[in-house]
Amino acid sequence: KAIGETISFPSFEDLVEWRKALPTQCMLVSGTFDAMGVVPVAIKGKEAPGEVSASKAYLAHREQPGILIIDIDYKNEDEVAGLYLGGQQPYETHNAALEALRAVLPELDGCALMIGWSTSSNLFNKAGNQVKGTGGIRIYIPVTDASKIPMLLEVMHKRSWLHGEGWGFVAVGGNFEERSL
């Protein structure tokens, strides 16, 4: 079984240092579990008593300091039935993503943040050959009240589309999926 842990950091800088040292098999999720400390994590819908899943049923954005995680994942043409932008990925560099983010959310000027490649990016096999290149970007932004993260994400989504930073794709099942910063 996997384990989940809710951790509190004295500062954003402490979180950044911790994140940089995190092994690749670990991931950060948006929101926190009810209690601090370690908890067993199961697949959504298969939780036993005392277990949680990394789902909205167990993770919440609480009224406390937290981290807004912006996850910009790309879709390959073979993953979708159709891709808006003619298959072009919206941001190929960290600077391009930050420039777009600052246009959408100018309130971020002067704000601390951390940016890096998604864990699905730059993957290599045991022989050292790259099997996947850039697959997405993650941006971490400290907030004073994490309960406002869902509202902030909605504002960012709307502003993204207004600033030309929205895109979409037709999923294999035929539904249209909107994406933005």
Residue ranges: model-predicted function:
Residues 1-137, 141-163:
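Signature for HUH/AEP ssDNA processing cores
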Residues 161-181:
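Flexible helix-coil linker/hinge segments at domain or subdomain boundaries
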